[in-house]
């Protein structure tokens, strides 16, 4: 409990923006990037150096009750501070709308048990006054849409992606993100979608992230989709916290297809490759991160948000609702040193950002591991082969080639001398 209190205080301090701001802003740069962090706030400088352009910040920042603490009285102080801070660091925001305000919850949810949160105890039921909630969403989106009307003073990076709550199927301590039925969440999703589009027709609505593909999780979401959810979001959203290098993508794509939503782009807004029950070294996790990101991009993921950028000073235990991560899977360790995962992330970004086409040569999944991966990524006017597994590369790779490993180290090698391992390499023909 003490650790949770310290962690809550850390979040509160960071929400208030009590840190130095560097100067930079180019609103278009990185908007189409595939790479982000949750949250980049823990280390903006290294998040950018690792190739990230997107932040999925603390949920409390865009919570109804944070911004409208009393009905009809808006206070954007903390949210504005965050938006100014994140845009000065050159990051775009995926904002997570939390549809909870204490004054509203008291109207019809006094029977619900209070849930611990960084902002105190609260209930997390469906809004009692849905029209008041929609009015809040309209005001929120209008403030950050960048249309010049009622915008935040100094807004440079408009917010164009709005996520509707988080893992609503998670309803048992120590992780309770929602207290309600699939129908309740569907009604929130529909109301939010309508309000977002009314305020900004160009904005995109992101489904609240699915916590995973366990049967009980899928059961909740199937009921949401049965009510017509696919009509009320633009981007599908999956999480994978230690679920394997496949990041739940094959089963999630199957689920979307079965629910007539296969045409929806999808993001993985929580990625963590550390397995709490099978600890590995940072070097092994770096290879795992590279395999999972390459696999995800090759299989259609549009954006990836890595969770364990850097550990906060005080992290609650797993029993207290903490994530159970360690320094083994951070990009920046507790001493501020860059880890092998940092370089693996950066190398994937440098090699594959802005690719326009990908072809699979070979792919093999076994349990949680992508045992083999061979792909052709087309970027600019060249082909980048990304390879791992066993044996030699495809015979179509001939002569001398440039080989880059996941640390970013480059060598010129004869193609017939290359032997694949479980650590991906990027192979490019040498331009004459």
Where is each model-derived feature located?
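Bacterial N-terminal signal peptides that target proteins for export
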Residues: 1-9
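Bacterial N-terminal signal peptides
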Residues: 9-19
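N-terminal substrate-binding region of glycoside hydrolase catalytic domains
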Residues: 26-159, 163, 169, 173-175
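Active-site cleft segment of glycoside hydrolase catalytic domains centered on the general acid/base Glu
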Residues: 108-233, 240-254, 271, 275-291, ...
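Beta-strand-rich binding/interaction modules
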Residues: 392-412
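C-terminal beta-strand-rich structural cap/linker in extracellular carbohydrate-active enzymes
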Residues: 412-432
């Amino acid at each position: 409990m003490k650790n949770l209190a310290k962690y809550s205080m850390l979040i509160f301090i960071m929400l208030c923006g009590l840190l130095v701001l560097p100067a930079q802003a180019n609103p278009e740069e990185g908007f189409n990037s595939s790479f982000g962090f949750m949250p980049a706030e823990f280390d903006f400088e290294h998040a950018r150096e690792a190739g990230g352009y997107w932040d999925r910040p603390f949920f409390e920042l865009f919570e109804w009750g944070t911004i409208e603490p009393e009905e009809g009285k808006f206070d954007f102080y903390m949210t504005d501070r965050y938006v100014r801070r994140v845009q000065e660091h050159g990051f775009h925001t995926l904002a997570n709308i939390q549809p909870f305000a204490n004054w509203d919850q008291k109207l019809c949810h006094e029977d619900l048990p209070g849930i611990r949160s960084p902002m105190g105890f609260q209930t997390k039921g469906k809004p009692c006054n849905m029209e008041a909630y929609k009015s809040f969403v309209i005001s929120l989106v209008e403030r950050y849409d960048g249309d010049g009307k009622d915008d935040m003073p100094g807004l440079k990076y408009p917010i164009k992606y709005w996520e509707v709550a988080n893992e609503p199927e998670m309803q048992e301590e120590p992780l309770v993100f929602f207290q309600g039925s699939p129908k309740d969440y569907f009604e929130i999703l529909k109301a939010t979608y309508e309000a977002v589009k009314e305020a900004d027709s160009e904005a995109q609505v992101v489904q609240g992230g699915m916590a995973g593909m366990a049967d009980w999780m899928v059961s909740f979401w199937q009921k949401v989709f049965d009510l017509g959810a696919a009509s009320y979001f633009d981007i599908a959203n999956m999480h994978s916290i230690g679920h394997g290098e496949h990041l739940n993508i094959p089963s999630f794509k199957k689920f979307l297809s079965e629910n007539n939503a296969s045409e929806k782009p999808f993001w993985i807004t929580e990625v963590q490759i550390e397995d709490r029950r099978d600890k590995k070294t940072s070097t092994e996790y770096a290879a795992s991160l590279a395999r999972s990101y390459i696999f995800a991009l090759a299989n259609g993921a549009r954006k990836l948000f890595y969770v364990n950028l850097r550990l906060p000073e005080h992290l609650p235990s797993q029993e207290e609702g903490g994530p159970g991560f360690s320094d083994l899977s951070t990009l920046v360790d507790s001493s501020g040193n860059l880890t092998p995962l940092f370089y693996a992330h950066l190398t994937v970004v440098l090699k594959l950002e802005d690719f326009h086409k990908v072809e699979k040569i070979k792919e093999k999944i076994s349990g949680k591991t992508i045992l083999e991966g061979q792909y052709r990524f087309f970027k600019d006017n060249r082909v980048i082969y990304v390879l791992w597994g066993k044996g030699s590369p495809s015979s179509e790779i001939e002569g001398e080639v440039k080989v880059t490993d996941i640390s970013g180290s480059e060598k010129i090698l004869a193609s017939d001398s290359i032997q694949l391992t479980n650590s991906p390499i990027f192979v490019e023909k040498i331009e004459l």
